[in-house]
């Protein structure tokens, strides 16, 4: 079995709450240079819920461009809005993300059928 190792990436913010891309790049380099096969950007550990839609697009686009095939990029594309989730997922794949990961609906009671349909 050929296992792959992925690291969920924390999102680094500047004092003004913008994304600190210099820190992000340093973190990408660190994990990829130390045996990790790929990253998960914009997931739960990356505070996806704190990013507006444009910030999420920029975070994904920057990660794909910066990593430039040195590792696998999985983009967290879950949003509270179904259409935003679909659009962000399509955006990530078109930008070159290797895969997307989508969190199911949260903070609301959903049946298994509701989650499946989502």
Where are the language model's segments positioned?
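Active-site beta->alpha loop and helix N-cap motifs at the rims of alpha/beta catalytic domains
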Residues: 1-7, 11-118
